[in-house]
């Protein structure tokens, strides 16, 4: 299967794995045979982590991640990867600011996304 991304520069190092010939589930989407790529407790502060947005960055990838605490409350964290499979997750939560630049941490950060506008990425 060929992967075609529209309106973006070529990504020659994007990790991709073909669906195994013996894959029997009817799901139309094949992911990766060794999922999950991030296990439980990736840092002492995070009980579970979910990939929400990954983008190519410099010589690898960055991701904004929903990291659920032991109490179930999610916050946003930043991850770095050279290959898109093996990740290092920062221990500090991503700091947010309001329109005036004042610190404003969301009480519940769920399903963050990255949007690139010109040369700047924004977390929404």
Please tell me what each predicted stretch does:
Residues 1-107, 115-124:
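Beta-rich carbohydrate-recognition and catalytic domains
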């Amino acid at each position: 299967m060929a992967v075609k991304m529209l309106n973006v520069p070529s990504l020659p190092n994007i990790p991709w794995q073909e669906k195994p010939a013996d894959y029997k589930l009817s799901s139309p989407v094949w992911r990766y045979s060794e999922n999950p790529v991030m296990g439980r407790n990736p840092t002492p502060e995070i009980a579970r982590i979910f990939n929400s947005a990954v983008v190519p960055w410099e010589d690898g990838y960055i991701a904004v991640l929903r990291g659920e605490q032991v109490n179930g409350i999610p916050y946003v964290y930043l991850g770095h990867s050279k290959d898109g499979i093996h990740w290092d997750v920062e221990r500090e939560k991503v700091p947010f600011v309001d329109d005036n630049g004042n610190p404003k941490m969301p009480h519940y950060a769920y399903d963050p996304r990255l949007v690139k506008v010109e040369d700047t990425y924004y977390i929404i």
